[in-house]
Amino acid sequence: MDKKEIFQSVTSMEEQLSHLYRQLVQLKEHVVQLLEENHHLQIENDHLRRRLEQVTSELAEEKQKEKDHKHGHERKLVDIGEGYDNLARLYQEGFHICHVHYGSVRKEGDCLFCLSFLNKK
């Protein structure tokens, strides 16, 4: 190899290193964006879980008040039926009963679709 070929080889490696460095910088920026987005989504998820718990407890309290009110006036409760009882039991055992995830195991707490189905009259 003569000096010119060595110089061209070094110049080529320098360009390749420069290109790899630019790619590394872009990748680093993308990772930062993903980490920020993940953090924001975790915060939003926590807020939604708290709101779901709040709404669920409010609905339970409201339902209890309504039930107490009906018993106070000696009204007969409508017999919901065996099918509803079976679905409620499945839900309590940890399975989805909603049309979206029917039959799959609930992994993270309550499901809004299932709860809305159970709260229908």
Swiss-Prot record:
InterPro entries: YabA. Binds 1 zinc ion per subunit. Its cofactor is Zn(2+). Zn(2+) binds at residues 96, 98, 111, 114. GO terms for cellular component: nucleoid. Signal peptide: none annotated. The keyword NAD does not apply. One of its GO terms (biological process) is DNA replication. It holds the Pfam family YabA. The keyword Zinc applies. Keywords: Cytoplasm, DNA replication, DNA replication inhibitor, Metal-binding, Zinc. It is found in: Cytoplasm, Nucleoid. Homotetramer. Interacts with both DnaA and DnaN, acting as a bridge between these two proteins. Belongs to the YabA family. Involved in control of chromosome replication initiation. Inhibits the cooperative binding of DnaA to the oriC region, thus negatively regulating initiation of chromosome replication. Inhibits the ability of DnaA-ATP to form a helix on DNA; does not disassemble preformed DnaA-DNA helices. Decreases the residence time of DnaA on the chromosome at its binding sites (oriC, replication forks and promoter-binding sites). Tethers DnaA to the replication machinery via the DNA polymerase beta sliding clamp subunit (dnaN). This is Replication initiation control protein YabA. It comes from Geobacillus sp. (strain WCH70).
